[in-house]
Structures are given as structure tokens and as C-alpha cells.
Amino acid sequence: MACPSLACCLLGLLALTSACYIQNCPLGGKRAALDLDMRKCLPCGPGGKGRCFGPSICCADELGCFVGTAEALRCQEENYLPSPCQSGQKPCGSGGRCATAGICCSPDGCRTDPACDPESAFSER
């Protein structure tokens, strides 16, 4: 009689300990978040021609970057969206991405970076 009840207790404990206790697990488990495609960040700037690179940074190819200006106000909305986003094509600097010609931006700010210069891709031959 003790064996069946012991087996039931062990199965019950196993079921309880294998549950996910983290309340904000992504659908499909913890590793599923790595498989998701990053969405493009919100459009910003004049005519919506730019993309957000941080909560107060908006960059557009033709216009350059706006940091802390009215053009970048829309970028603050990214803080309230549940999924991460990514702007820019090529990684650069320390956790940044190329925003415009010669400019590398991360959520912390922008700086010049020769890796983002479109002419440098052709001059390295």
C-alpha cells in the first residue's frame, strides 16, 4: 500500500517542479525568444523617413540623426512596446548599428565610426 502512494507523491512532485515559475516566459519557452525575428523600430522624424535607434534618437539616411529633439519624441513609444526592435543594417561600435553614412548609434547615443562609411567598403581592397 505504501508503494503506490509513494509513487503518486513522487509523480506529483515531479509535475510541480518541472513547471515554469517565471511569469513572463515567452510563448514556447525561454529559448523561443531567440528564434523570433526582430521587428523594425518605429518610424520617426519628418515625414516618418527615419527609424528610432534609442528612446531619444531618430536617424534617417537623407537627414542625419536627431538626438533629443521633437523629431525623436515618437521614439519614446518604443519603451512601451512588448517586443524588441532593431534599426540599421550593420553592427558597429559597442552594441550599436550603422544609422547613416559614417554614424554609429546605440540606445545611449551616436558617434562617428569609419565602419559605417559606405565608401570604406570599397576602399579596403
Swiss-Prot record:
Cystine pairs: 20-25, 41-85, 44-58, 52-75, 59-65, 92-104, 98-116, 105-110
Gene Ontology, cellular component aspect: cytoplasm; extracellular region; extracellular space; neuronal dense core vesicle; secretory granule; terminal bouton
GO biological process, one term: male mating behavior
GO molecular function: neurohypophyseal hormone activity; neuropeptide hormone activity; oxytocin receptor binding; V1A vasopressin receptor binding
Modification sites for Glycine amide: 28
Family: Belongs to the vasopressin/oxytocin family.
Subunit structure: Interacts with oxytocin receptor (Ki=1.5 nM). Interacts with vasopressin V1aR/AVPR1A (Ki=37 nM), V1bR/AVPR1B (Ki=222 nM), and V2R/AVPR2 receptors (Ki=823 nM).
Protein's recorded name: Oxytocin-neurophysin 1
Provenance organism: Rattus norvegicus
